[in-house]
Amino acid sequence: GEALGLSWLDYDPEAMELRIVRQYTSDKTLRPPKSEMSRRILSIDKALTEYLDKWKTMQRDIFRRRGLEQKDTDPIVHAFSVGKDADGFRSISVTRPSGHNYSRWFRDFCVDNGYGTYSDVTKQFMRDGKLHTRGTGYSGLVPHGLRHTAATALVASNVDLKTVQARMGHASASTTANFYTHAIRANDRNAAEVFELLSSK
């Protein structure tokens, strides 16, 4: 919900930051995040900043081709809604994708790029010289799983738990430690070696 809640006004390329101040919920409503700790400013790296800058330019071109002007209030992750204006003419507006549609897109993207599979393939087609597969019974990467991976990687890289907690937006460090970080084998080996050093003194 937090990623779908981001608008361009939440992105500061000079400071290399994203402001998390709202989430887009399953009932298609923008709401404040779950807790005060969930409202946060995330530092981002140069690669993500460059990607977002390129995406903003690409999105502006996509909008212009549809007769729309990009605004700072537009979502970073967008969809289009087609309807009728007051005079009954077809109109296109910018909206946010539903969580369901985003999840479907994410699964298809992962399958098409080798990060997931469908156990029951219902359709295959070629686009731009690449085979695309659609189906049911997905297994592979899921967006929420990436949060667990990020938290675990940060702890494994010796980022302190309070900083990881703040980045995840958790009200409690115990939530981060108990549910979002996972044991890393190399760290267990290091712990054994530290114990050996301590016990030999």
Describe the residue ranges of each PLM region:
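Acidic donor-binding helix in nucleotide-sugar-dependent glycosyltransferases
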Residues: 1-2, 163
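Short, basic, alpha-helical segments at the C-terminal edge of helix-turn-helix-like DNA-binding modules
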Residues: 193-199
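Conserved tyrosine-mediated DNA breakage-rejoining catalytic core shared by Y-recombinases
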Residues: 5-74
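Ser/Thr-centric signal marking residues that sit
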Residues: 35, 149-152, 163, 175-176, ...
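Short, polar N-cap/turn motifs at the start of nucleic acid-interacting alpha helices
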Residues: 10-17, 159-179
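Catalytic-site neighborhood detector that most strongly recognizes the C-terminal catalytic loop/helix
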Residues: 24-26, 168-193
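Short, basic (Lys/Arg/His-rich) helix/loop patches that form interaction surfaces
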Residues: 42, 60-75, 83-96, 100-166, ...
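The DNA-recognition helices of helix-turn-helix-type DNA-binding domains
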Residues: 10, 59, 149, 171, ...
